[in-house]
């Protein structure tokens, strides 16, 4: 059980919440802050004060005063009118993450909702009722209005949910779980939909998958080094300490650990003086991608615990301030950076694939074919990898450099952060398939070199991989092999810890 406080949620906790479906509870002290802030909102309504989002319309309608008797209708209208998402739904993990993050931001006690609203969000999480939320339609400021409106519909007993493996109307799930839909009161509709939880939840999922892939890429690259009789001297710690980047030093250390008892890697001058960059510069390139991952994680953990609502309520209602914390620019930049960092792992992997299959670049059978000429072997696998990395270059174009004014130019600059986050996840799926292709080719090369000569770590990895796909003894439909390895890398992440390889120094 993870206790939400509004200020201490971590990516590691989100891993458990999203993938192990661990439950959540609210910190009592934080809930007390929620209750106190709610009292301030009710006093504002009772006194008839003009406060944006509480007693006024929204966006360009901020100068329209709402009568006390119309406040509840205002909130309901807001949710229904803003539920304009389109396209395929987000994965359930993202939907679940949005519920958790929205509850966590409310627990900061500056949004003005009743504790009832927070409790309803937590009930949905704990009962695995996940809103069906279309992926497209958010500008990333005022936050993720459309996606979060689809989330909010479920609290009202409207919209659809994923429940017990099916896509059903929200009321079916609520009724089966004995939950009553709620009626939103002043400020609560706006507090539910004004924020960056869609881009952040998708960003968390993307980061978690990217981190696992980054480790797996080092194992796969190590196996390629063996298949190509790579020079281990390039990974000497003196080389990497001379440059000074922590992440580069750590990648070199991990690869030395992985290959420490390999009989296939060579010494400088043994077969050749130096390797091509895609082998020699693995620590420099993969290390730079780790720098990106560290940056992204830092920004995500700030945003996970941020108040991204508007307006925010301070000092018992004495200060109700309209700000712009809903603007997704920090996450938009982080997601665009993640796109570039992960695309580069695929770029260098594709070049290693080329070195594994090109007979002009190695002494292996052409295209790793068992019968060159009669059988094409891995020839078209490299085509597939080239296509995937080329697609990544298009997806890696920064979404955050774009902005389109909305709400009659009241919201005249937006982040496009959710587009960046979605594209980051698409890139990561492509990267995984490129790495799957490299792994298939590296395993085949290792067989030609001699499996018994591999390091202890790569030998284990090889045998695990061979449980997913057989050796290439004849041409076959290799698409199936690629998807099988990619699925295995995603669902059964083979970690460095399982190979007794230190993840960090």
Swiss-Prot record:
> In which family does this protein belong, per the annotation?
Belongs to the PAL/histidase family.
Keywords, comma-separated and alphabetical: Cytoplasm, Histidine metabolism, Lyase
Tell me the Gene Ontology biological-process terms attached to this UniProt entry: L-histidine catabolic process to glutamate and formamide; L-histidine catabolic process to glutamate and formate
5-imidazolinone (Ala-Gly): where is this cross-link? 141-143
Task: State any single GO MF term.
Answer: histidine ammonia-lyase activity
Give the subcellular location: Cytoplasm
Gene3D superfamilies associated with the record:
Fumarase/aspartase (Central domain), Fumarase/aspartase (N-terminal domain)
- Where in this protein does the record say 2,3-didehydroalanine (Ser) is found? 142
CDD domains recorded for this chain?
Answer: PAL-HAL (cd00332)
The EC number(s) attached to this protein equal: 4.3.1.3
The opening ranks of the lineage are: Bacteria, Bacillati, Bacillota, Bacilli, Bacillales
Listed name of the protein? Histidine ammonia-lyase
Chief place of localization: cytoplasm
Residue intervals passing through the bilayer: none
Q: Which reaction does it catalyse?
A: L-histidine = trans-urocanate + NH4(+)
- Organism whose genome encodes this protein: Bacillus cytotoxicus (strain DSM 22905 / CIP 110041 / 391-98 / NVH 391-98)
Give the superkingdom in one word: Bacteria
A GO CC term assigned to this protein in UniProt:
cytoplasm
């Amino acid at each position: 059980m993870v206790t939400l406080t509004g200020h201490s949620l971590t990516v590691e906790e989100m891993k458990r919440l999203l993938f192990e479906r661990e439950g959540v509870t609210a910190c009592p002290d934080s809930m007390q802050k929620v209750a106190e802030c709610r009292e301030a909102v009710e006093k504002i309504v009772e006194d008839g004060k003009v406060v944006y989002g509480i007693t006024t319309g929204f966006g360009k309608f901020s100068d329209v005063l709402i009568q006390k008797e119309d406040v509840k209708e205002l909130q309901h209208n807001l949710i229904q009118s803003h539920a304009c998402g389109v396209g395929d739904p987000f994965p359930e993990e993202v939907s679940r993450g949005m519920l958790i993050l929205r509850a966590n931001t409310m627990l900061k006690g500056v949004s003005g909702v009743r504790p009832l609203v927070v409790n309803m969000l937590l009930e949905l999480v704990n009962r695995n009722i996940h809103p069906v939320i279309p992926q497209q339609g958010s500008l990333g400021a005022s936050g993720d209005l459309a996606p979060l409106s689809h989330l909010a519909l479920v609290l009202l007993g409207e919209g659809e949910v994923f429940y017990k493996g099916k896509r059903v109307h929200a009321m079916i799930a609520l009724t089966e779980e004995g939950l009553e839909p709620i009626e939103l009161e002043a400020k609560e509709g706006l507090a539910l939909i004004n924020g960056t939880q869609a881009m952040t939840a998708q960003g968390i999922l993307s980061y978690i998958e990217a981190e696992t892939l980054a480790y797996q890429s080092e194992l796969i690259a190590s196996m390629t080094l063996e298949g190509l009789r790579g020079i281990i001297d390039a990974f000497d710690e003196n080389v990497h300490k001379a440059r000074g980047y922590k992440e580069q030093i750590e990648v070199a250390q991990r690869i030395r650990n992985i290959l420490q008892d390999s009989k296939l890697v060579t010494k400088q001058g043994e077969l050749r003086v130096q390797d091509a960059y895609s082998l020699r510069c693995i620590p420099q390139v993969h290390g730079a991608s780790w720098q990106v991952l560290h940056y992204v994680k830092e920004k995500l953990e700030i945003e996970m615990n941020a108040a991204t609502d508007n307006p925010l309520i301070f000092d018992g209602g004495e200060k109700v301030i309209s700000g712009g914390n809903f603007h997704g620019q920090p996450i938009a930049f982080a997601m665009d950076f993640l796109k570039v960092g992960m695309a580069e792992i695929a770029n260098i992997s594709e070049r290693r694939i080329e070195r594994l299959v090109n007979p002009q670049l190695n002494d292996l059978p052409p295209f790793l074919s068992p019968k060159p000429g009669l059988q094409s072997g891995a020839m078209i696998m490299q085509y597939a990898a080239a296509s995937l990395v080329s697609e990544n270059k298009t997806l890696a174009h920064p979404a955050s450099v774009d902005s389109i004014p909305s709400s009659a130019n009241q919201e005249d600059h937006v982040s496009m952060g959710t587009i960046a986050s979605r594209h980051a996840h698409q890139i990561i799926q492509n990267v995984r398939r490129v790495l799957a292709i490299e792994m298939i080719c590296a395993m085949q090369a290792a067989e030609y070199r001699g499996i018994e000569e591999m390091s202890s770590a790569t030998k284990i990895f090889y045998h695990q991989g061979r449980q997913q796909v057989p050796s290439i003894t004849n041409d076959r439909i290799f698409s199936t092999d690629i998807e099988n390895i990619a699925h295995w890398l995603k669902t059964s992440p083979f970690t460095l810890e399982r190979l007794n390889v230190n993840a960090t120094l």
